[in-house]
């Protein structure tokens, strides 16, 4: 019994992370990291970025400077709630204001004199409007006193049209590990980026590349375009670190394989030969000469000393305040990795590994845009001052330059889906699935331009570094995003940290490292470098590395550093480094701690008894060594046991090899995959397809559906699922339902439900089963004069409009009805006409196939009249609509049967839905049967022994055997009726019933699987996809039907359709469709000399080619299709001559007919 209790403990600890933790300020775990990210930006980082004091221009050897100072940054929340914003049709924005002062500083003997040039106190209500993130319960970071709506999880922005916007998280381009690349055989590069810490603004970026060619080892250089000299990497390391070449040789060779040592000796010897080739070589003189040559090459306006200081001081910005000697040792450690990676490439994290990348969250998006737009703003002010001084001789700034920071345009572009000129960042939230409010903000994707042809296939594979941190099931199965977008697992989150916290944490870690004996942290020749965010701070004695890492991890868990998400990675495998990561954008998740071969969960006997009354933060405080937050880099270089069960089966010696132990399999799924049931009991593709279909499931009504002029599909009578997982419950996906329980039967029905066809009961539909309401936005823009014009002739299209020209509320719109008045008028130039004014209707019509009721109408009056109409329509299931179970058993309505046509059981109950039974075997969805069994068992005993209602926990991925669930169902039925026989009990457990034929009232020979299941209706609706029409608009060029339902399009008649008719021998039909219709008929004159199509000049047809040669062409009129004429014209325009030739033969009636011998063959 103890073993079972222990195996459940890890599951209970995992559940504690998922539930809210008010003591730690966590009210909704799935999106908490997004709330914190945006809160850090709006409350802290925005002030840091906008508060600026720096020189714009300098004159007379820097004795005169034009300065800019931005201060008094204030951020004001809106006065209204998100619902009011939706009603008004406005965006939900915070207002940021600041003061700009531009002055001139003159340095004189008496001191510095300041002369004011310009000042602007920004109080404009439209200066900077920052889209405000709506948090859990309609709260926002600036005003937490807003009333609480618990089921509103937030995580969205509202744009100016009251449309919700959500976005994915992008993988940052800059990597934290250098990128290794094989240029050609025996030629390699090692490129890396250096970014200044967050406390240094503006952020400085430097990108360096180390090149190595085996055939030219003297040219093993490091370079950076226009920011650094091109210099031998060994000599640069020697110049910075002030050590000998022998020291560098010993440092690079320590603990390296023989082949790497050979290459090290060759590189050091080549550097030595380079120094010997220069007479009286001096390393300082050598570097100075290179700097002077670069100064001349760049034609810099700075003095040589200023140029050298700028170049060397800004070298490696991430080690900005670090001595040059440590920079030199850092370069040696990089060169060590480079040389090792040449021989052991597979052991080094590649560029696609998530170990190398940080992730941009909502706050980081806005931070990056604010930083870039501020630099543009300051640059515009600088250019304006220079232009005014050049043209007028005065230092002045135009007021419009000061009042247009440009941040509004950047933020609105962000919500429109453009982040730094790339796509895929944000998108409109589709309201057909409440679940996507969670899934989209927890998605991680690559930049579109990151995916080049050369690396496309390597990126799109499931990378090993994504294991445990990403959901392996919830990935796009088709389309351009395959392999590029991944979903975080339920335990994963993304780190956030304030600048002040970052500096304090860095200081505490440095103090801890320096508390060691000085000689033990100064092993720069053969030690393990210790880096904090890639900045070298010490080099540790190799004999102390295990004790150091173990002690550091223990102190971290105990809160010694004040941050539980610090990552410490011990990189062995000859690369020898201790990496400490504290920055934002890292993927972290909890793991169970293994210390000296013992699972720390077992060492705390009090934990089990107190666990029910504790939150996750309580566990971290009172039992700090049980769980550790581990980032993805630390996880990759640690030994992690897959499960507690496997860990317990190992010997003591094997256990000591592990550092961490993982939680059960259900915690490796994302929140979308957690809505499925029994993934591990089904075939693999069902999980991927199931996640895609769960996102398309229509969910319950949103919070203020009537106030948003937005598209949406909503389930009318949703039901909470009975069979759920813990993640589904804690994320409130279960409470905000996405389906209904229906009674299904697995059987064949008159051959109608073949393949994916399903039979649905008519009375079930009439009672509101899986009924939905569709909200649709219709938007038109009308010129003001057209809107004010009055119609001269009564039009049926305007029958639903009121006298004000707008459609009236609660009117039922049909196809062809106008939604607003739009009458264009024109004046005829005819003096004899009585009325030379003509008018005609140009309004946009309602085009849907179904009638809709007008719910709301919004109007904006500017230079144009913008009308937005929200229509509602109840949509009951019809033929062709799609449904699915949570095991990816998608079906299409093939027949709607009356109750009298359906089979029934002994109680007269008929199934709501009949599904083809062979689909279970072909798709191998055993968990669908388990879900029916568990749902039926719940209906028999919906309460536990304490009288409390309890849903059935059936996790998406679980390690529970099917026999356990069968035993649970057996206990439910025995509790309800203990006198059941073994056969009756078996039938109830396995949901097998005898059904009766409705026509003969006789029982079927076989028992039928019959029971309840949670059924989902998908957004694929028949009436939204039908595009068949008899007549309609055509394109001007090829005169084929338009594409898309919105443009009134139809189905094009192309080559494949033509071939089908040819196969049927329908020659007259082809002629009629492709040629004889009045739109496609085309008369063409062909020149019989050259085969060109004749041109029409002043109503005269002539051949241009023959007329230039003074020939007399013979033009013949032929009838052909318009498309043929367009094809010939386009081919001629591309330089391809297509000659139309006529068949030369005499007419058949001029030639005598051939004689036919009618004699029988035997007489011939």
Swiss-Prot record:
GO cellular component: DNA-directed RNA polymerase complex; virion component
Protein keywords: DNA-directed RNA polymerase, Metal-binding, Nucleotidyltransferase, Phosphoprotein, Transcription, Transferase, Virion
Root EC class: transferase
A Pfam short name: RNA_pol_Rpb2_3
UniProt-listed Enzyme Commission number(s): 2.7.7.6
Compartment annotation: Virion
Any GO MF annotation of the entry: ribonucleoside binding
Chief location category: virion
Effect of residue 296 to I: In strain: Garcia-1966
Catalysed reactions, semicolon-separated: RNA(n) + a ribonucleoside 5'-triphosphate = RNA(n+1) + diphosphate
Single biological process term from Gene Ontology: DNA-templated transcription
Family: Belongs to the RNA polymerase beta chain family.
Subunit structure: The DNA-dependent RNA polymerase used for intermediate and late genes expression consists of eight subunits 147 kDa, 133 kDa, 35 kDa, 30 kDa, 22 kDa, 19 kDa, 18 kDa and 7 kDa totalling more than 500 kDa in mass. The same holoenzyme, with the addition of the transcription-specificity factor RAP94, is used for early gene expression.
Known role: Part of the DNA-dependent RNA polymerase which catalyzes the transcription of viral DNA into RNA using the four ribonucleoside triphosphates as substrates. Responsible for the transcription of early, intermediate and late genes. DNA-dependent RNA polymerase associates with the early transcription factor (ETF), itself composed of OPG118 and OPG133, thereby allowing the early genes transcription. Late transcription, and probably also intermediate transcription, require newly synthesized RNA polymerase.
Protein name in the entry: DNA-directed RNA polymerase 133 kDa polypeptide
Species per Swiss-Prot/TrEMBL record: Variola virus
Organism taxonomic ancestry: Viruses, Varidnaviria, Bamfordvirae, Nucleocytoviricota, Pokkesviricetes
Gene: OPG151
């Amino acid at each position: 019994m103890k073993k079972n209790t222990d195996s459940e403990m890890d599951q209970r600890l995992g559940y504690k992370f998922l539930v809210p933790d008010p003591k730690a300020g966590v009210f909704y775990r799935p999106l908490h990291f997004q709330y914190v990210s945006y809160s850090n930006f709006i409350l802290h980082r925005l002030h840091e970025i906008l508060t600026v004091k720096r020189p714009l221009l300098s004159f007379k050897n820097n004795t005169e400077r034009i300065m800019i100072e931005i201060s008094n940054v204030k951020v004001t929340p809106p006065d209204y709630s998100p619902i009011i914003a939706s009603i008004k049709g406005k965006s939900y924005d915070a207002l940021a204001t600041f003061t700009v002062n531009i002055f001139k500083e003159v340095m004189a003997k008496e001191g510095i004199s300041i002369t004011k040039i310009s000042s602007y106190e920004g109080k404009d209500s439209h200066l900077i409007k920052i889209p405000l993130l709506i948090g859990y319960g309609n709260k926002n970071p600036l005003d937490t006193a807003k009333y609480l709506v618990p089921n509103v999880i937030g995580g969205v922005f509202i744009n100016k049209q009251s449309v919700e916007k959500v976005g994915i998280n992008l993988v940052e381009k800059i990597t934290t590990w250098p990128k290794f690349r094989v240029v050609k055989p025996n030629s390699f590069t090692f490129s890396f980026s250096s970014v200044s810490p967050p406390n240094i603004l503006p952020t400085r970026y430097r990108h360096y590349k180390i090149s190595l060619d085996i055939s030219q080892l003297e040219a093993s250089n490091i370079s950076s375009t226009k920011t650094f000299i091109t210099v031998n990497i060994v000599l640069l390391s020697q110049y910075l670190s002030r050590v000998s070449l022998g020291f560098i040789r010993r440092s690079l060779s320590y603990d390296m394989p023989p082949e790497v040592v050979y290459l090290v000796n060759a590189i050091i010897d080549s550097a030595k030969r380079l120094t010997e080739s220069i007479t009286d070589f001096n390393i300082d003189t050598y570097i100075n000469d290179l700097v002077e040559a670069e100064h001349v090459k760049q034609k810099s306006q700075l003095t040589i000393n200023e140029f050298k200081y700028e170049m060397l001081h800004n070298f490696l910005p991430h080690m900005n305040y670090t001595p040059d000697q440590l920079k030199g040792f850092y370069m040696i450690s990089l060169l060590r990795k480079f040389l090792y990676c040449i021989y052991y490439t597979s052991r080094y994290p590649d560029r696609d590994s998530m170990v190398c990348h940080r992730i941009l969250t909502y706050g980081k998006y806005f931070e990056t845009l604010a930083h870039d737009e501020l630099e543009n703003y300051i640059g515009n002010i600088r250019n304006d001052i220079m232009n005014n001084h050049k043209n007028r001789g005065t230092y002045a700034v135009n007021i419009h330059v000061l009042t247009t920071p440009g941040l509004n345009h950047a933020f609105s572009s962000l919500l429109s889906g453009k982040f730094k000129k790339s796509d895929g960042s944000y998108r409109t939230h589709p309201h057909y699935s409440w679940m996507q409010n969670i899934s989209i903000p927890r998605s991680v994707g690559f930049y579109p331009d990151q995916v080049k042809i050369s690396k496309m296939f390597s990126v799109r594979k499931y990378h090993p570094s994504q294991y445990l941190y990403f959901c392996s099931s919830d990935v796009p199965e088709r389309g351009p995003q395959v392999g590029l977008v991944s979903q975080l697992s339920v335990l994963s989150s993304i780190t956030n940290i304030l600048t002040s916290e970052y500096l304090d944490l860095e200081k505490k870690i440095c103090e801890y490292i320096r508390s060691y004996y000085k000689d033990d942290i100064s092993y720069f020749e053969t030690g393990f470098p210790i880096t904090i965010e890639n900045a070298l701070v010490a080099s540790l004695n190799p004999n102390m590395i295990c004790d150091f890492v173990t002690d550091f991890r223990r102190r971290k868990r105990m809160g010694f550093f004040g941050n539980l998400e610090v990552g410490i990675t011990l990189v062995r495998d000859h690369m020898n480094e201790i990496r400490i990561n504290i920055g934002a954008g890292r993927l972290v998740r909890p793991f169970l701690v293994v210390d000296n071969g013992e699972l720390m969960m077992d060492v705390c006997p009090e934990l089990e008894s107190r666990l029910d009354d504790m939150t996750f933060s309580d566990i971290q405080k009172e039992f700090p060594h049980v769980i550790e937050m581990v980032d993805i880099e630390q996880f990759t270089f640690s030994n992690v046991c897959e499960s507690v069960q496997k860990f317990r089966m190992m010997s003591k010696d094997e256990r000591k090899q592990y550092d961490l132990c993982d939680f059960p399999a259900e915690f490796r799924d994302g929140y979308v995959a957690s809505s499925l049931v029994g993934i591990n009991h089904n075939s693999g593709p069902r999980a991927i397809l199931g996640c895609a279909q769960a996102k398309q499931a229509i969910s319950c009504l949103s919070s203020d559906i009537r106030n948003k002029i937005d598209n949406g599909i909503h389930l009318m009578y949703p039901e909470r699922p009975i069979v759920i997982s813990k993640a589904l419950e804690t994320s409130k996906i279960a409470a905000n339902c996405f389906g209904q329980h229906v009674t299904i039967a697995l059987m064949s029905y008159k051959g109608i439900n073949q393949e994916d066809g399903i039979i649905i009961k008519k009375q079930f539909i009439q009672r509101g089963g899986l009924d939905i309401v569709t909200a649709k936005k219709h938007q038109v823009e009308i010129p003001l004069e057209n809107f004010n014009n009055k119609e001269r002739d009564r039009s049926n299209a305007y029958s639903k409009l009121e006298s004000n020209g707008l459609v009236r509320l609660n009117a039922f719109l049909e196809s062809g009805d106008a939604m607003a008045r739009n009458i264009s008028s024109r004046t005829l130039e005819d003096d004899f006409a009585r009325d030379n004014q003509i008018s005609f209707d140009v309004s946009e019509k309602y085009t849907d196939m179904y009638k809709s009721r007008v719910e709301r109408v919004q109007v904006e009056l500017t230079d144009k009249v913008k009308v937005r109409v929200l229509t509602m329509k109840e949509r009951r299931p019809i033929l062709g609509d799609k449904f699915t179970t949570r095991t990816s058993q998608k079906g299409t309505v093939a027949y709607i049967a009356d109750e009298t046509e359906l089979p029934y059981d002994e109680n007269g109950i008929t199934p709501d839905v009949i599904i083809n039974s062979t689909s279970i075997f072909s798709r191998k969805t055993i968990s669908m049967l388990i879900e029916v069994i568990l749902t039926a068992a719940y209906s028999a005993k919906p309460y536990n022994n304490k009288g409390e209602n309890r849903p059935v926990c059936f996790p998406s991925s679980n390690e529970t055997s099917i026999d356990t669930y069968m035993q649970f169902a057996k206990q439910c039925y025995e509790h309800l009726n203990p006198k059941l026989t073994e056969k009756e009990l078996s039938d109830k457990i396995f949901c097998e019933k005898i059904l009766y034929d409705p026509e003969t009232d006789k029982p079927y020979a076989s028992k039928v699987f019959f029971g309840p299941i949670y059924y989902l209706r998908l957004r694929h609706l028949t009436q939204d996809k039908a595009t068949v029409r008899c007549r309609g608009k055509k394109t001007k060029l090829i005169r084929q039907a338009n594409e898309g339902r919105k443009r009134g399009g139809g189905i094009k008649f192309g080559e494949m359709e033509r071939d089908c008719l040819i196969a049927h021998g329908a020659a007259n039909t082809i002629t009629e469709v492709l040629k004889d219709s009045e739109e496609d008929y085309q008369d063409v004159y062909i020149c019989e000399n050259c085969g060109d199509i004749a041109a029409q000049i002043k109503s005269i047809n002539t051949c241009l080619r023959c007329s230039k040669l003074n020939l007399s062409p013979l033009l013949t009129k032929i009838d052909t299709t318009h498309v043929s004429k367009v094809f010939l014209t386009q081919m001629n325009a591309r330089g391809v001559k297509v000659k139309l030739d006529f068949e030369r033969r005499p007419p058949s009636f001029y030639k005598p007919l051939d004689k036919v011998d009618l004699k029988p063959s035997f007489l011939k």
